[in-house]
Amino acid sequence: MIRVLDILEDTMVDGPGFRTSIYCAGCNHQCPGCHNPQSWAFDGGCEMTTEQLLKIIIDDPFANVTFSGGDPMYQAAGFAELARAIREYTNKDIWCFTGFRFESLIHPDQLELLEQLDVLVDGPFIESLKDPDLLFRGSSNQRIIDVPKSLYEGKVVLWREDISI
């Protein structure tokens, strides 16, 4: 089960191309200037099963998937289960936004989720580093990480670091 605040279909702001973005409840980072402070409460939204979420994802054949929130890493076990199902039944790519740094994701559930992701946008939003020209992130401390390459190489490998708008 995942506690979900909202699902946006065919959005284009949470990664490249059209995406189905799943916004979860719960975040302890509480970054000043957060664009989604209503997501901080862990009891917000409603619980949804992997099957319910997978149906929504499959029913949008052209959209890839983004996990956001809140912070999906607080519900890593549920998102890992969903990501495994997405991998099994689709060829969609999976992005995830988190306020945690990649290097701090050491809980077994978080590592299991990481193994299913294509890209992780990591780090807290820092208002003094806000930059509207950054693609797919709000502040310059946040990184867009190629997760499979990073796990393979044992260090952070950035995803297409030359990208800007």
Outline where the language-model segments fall.
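N-terminal [4Fe-4S]-dependent radical SAM core
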Residues: 1-23, 32, 36-42, 156-157, ...
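Receiver (REC) domain switch/active-site residues of two-component response regulators
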Residues: 118
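P-loop/Walker A phosphate-binding loop and immediately adjacent motor/lid segment at beta-alpha junctions
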Residues: 75-84, 90, 130-165
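Short, hinge-like loop/turn segments at secondary-structure boundaries
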Residues: 112-115, 138-140
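Conserved Radical SAM active-site core
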Residues: 2-5, 18, 36-96, 100-113
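Short Gly/Pro-enriched loop/turn and capping motifs at secondary-structure junctions
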Residues: 101-103, 125-128
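Conserved C-terminal portion of the radical SAM core fold
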Residues: 61-68, 93, 121-127, 151-165
